[in-house]
Amino acid sequence: MPLYRQEKDWLQYGFELSRATIANWIIECTDKYLRVLYEFYHRLLLSIEFAMADESPIQVLKEEGHEATAKSYMWLFRSGEDDTPPIVLYKYASTRRGDVAKEFLKGFNGYLMADGYTGYNKVQDIKRCCCFSL
């Protein structure tokens, strides 16, 4: 549920709770409890034989140091094995530089399926696979 709706709901009950406070709670809980889980799955992803990657532009309206019209990127990394539950990890970056993939996939030495973006060439010790989507 969007934070502005939660803010309105709390106000209906007579409790003034700002979106900033709710957002800070979410960030704090995520950092404290979910980071460990994310890091566990990140290590697991690096240990498998086949992974997929893609990056998509997103627009962040209020980001410190960036104009509202600047492009940022959400990177997606996914396991490719069929016999296990999929691992899907997102990484936000303010850039599309291949260094993002290089750093995230450091230690991965399997097959990486991605589109033709040359930034993935910066990832060392991998075997590149072509993406067959049209």
Describe the predicted segments one by one:
Residues M1-L134:
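Catalytic center-proximal scaffold of phosphoryl-transfer enzymes
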